[in-house]
Amino acid sequence: MAYPLQLGLQDATSPIMEELMNFHDHTLMIVFLISSLVLYIISLMLTTKLTHTSTMDAQEVETIWTILPAAILVLIALPSLRILYMMDEINNPVLTVKTMGHQWYWSYEYTDYEDLCFDSYMIPTNDLKPGELRLLEVDNRVVLPMELPIRMLISSEDVLHSWAVPSLGLKTDAIPGRLNQATVSSNRPGLFYGQCSEICGSNHSFMPIVLEMVPLKYFENWSASMI
């Protein structure tokens, strides 16, 4: 989860988020190099009175500043496309969870189990226990097994919502009448927080998401107790 005054992204918990962080660093380095080059050229233009008479009519220079940006765009596009394809792949999920957005709460249905469904509301500030997080805690957490591929089917009952958990690299729109899907996979156990990331009305800020990733044994015990 994010902390006050935090710089940078949240700690990666899934392989997709690790890839996204690597891509962020890769792109940031390219942007830094381009910005440094531009600032250097501007400083030269401002500090020197010397000019090249054929600068504005140099075929070689035009060739360079046409090919070089194209090569840079390719360096950015290739890893980006690779990650997009990875995010779309869902290979043999062990579990499917249907997520529905409402104004202003989430409902979850474990489609592999009979009658395992519940609504998830934010806990009001006055009802929080010591150590719990304001505007992030819910009355029913989404319990999932760790280190296993899980398919999330995401839609909405009313208006546009967006189901997002940053530390897992997840952000999928919940659109009425349309079913989107995403893959959830966690490398470690723990609580992972998210929020609705699409302005959906006056209580948009009060739609937190809490995933509780546990070992498979504990998940089986939890699911048996819920049925």
Curated annotation (Swiss-Prot):
User: Where, in this chain's numbering, is Cu cation A2 bound?
Assistant: C196, E198, C200, H204
Q: What does the cofactor field's note say?
A: Binds a dinuclear copper A center per subunit.
The cofactors required by this protein are:
Cu cation
Per the record's keyword annotation, is Kinase included, yes or no? no
Q: Which UniProt keywords apply?
A: Copper, Electron transport, Magnesium, Membrane, Metal-binding, Mitochondrion, Mitochondrion inner membrane, Phosphoprotein, Respiratory chain, Translocase, Transmembrane, Transmembrane helix, Transport
- Any one GO biological process: ATP synthesis coupled electron transport
Q: What class of enzyme is it?
A: translocase
Spell out the subcellular localization from the entry.
Mitochondrion inner membrane
Question: Which intervals lie on the Mitochondrial intermembrane side per UniProt?
Answer: 1-14, 88-227
Write down the membrane topology: Multi-pass membrane protein
- A single Gene Ontology CC term: respiratory chain complex IV
PROSITE patterns cross-referenced by the UniProt entry: COX2 (PS00078), COX2_CUA (PS50857), COX2_TM (PS50999)
Residues bound to Cu cation A1 are H161, C196, C200, M207
Q: Which GO terms describe its molecular function?
A: copper ion binding; cytochrome-c oxidase activity
What the entry lists under SUPFAM superfamilies is as follows: Cupredoxins, Cytochrome c oxidase subunit II-like, transmembrane region
Give the protein's biological function. Component of the cytochrome c oxidase, the last enzyme in the mitochondrial electron transport chain which drives oxidative phosphorylation. The respiratory chain contains 3 multisubunit complexes succinate dehydrogenase (complex II, CII), ubiquinol-cytochrome c oxidoreductase (cytochrome b-c1 complex, complex III, CIII) and cytochrome c oxidase (complex IV, CIV), that cooperate to transfer electrons derived from NADH and succinate to molecular oxygen, creating an electrochemical gradient over the inner membrane that drives transmembrane transport and the ATP synthase.
Oligomeric state and partners? Component of the cytochrome c oxidase (complex IV, CIV), a multisubunit enzyme composed of 14 subunits. The complex is composed of a catalytic core of 3 subunits MT-CO1, MT-CO2 and MT-CO3, encoded in the mitochondrial DNA, and 11 supernumerary subunits COX4I, COX5A, COX5B, COX6A, COX6B, COX6C, COX7A, COX7B, COX7C, COX8 and NDUFA4, which are encoded in the nuclear genome.
Q: Into which family does the record put it?
A: Belongs to the cytochrome c oxidase subunit 2 family.
- Name the record gives this protein: Cytochrome c oxidase subunit 2
* Organism, scientific name: Micaelamys namaquensis
- Organism classification: Eukaryota, Metazoa, Chordata, Craniata, Vertebrata
Which gene underlies this protein?
MT-CO2
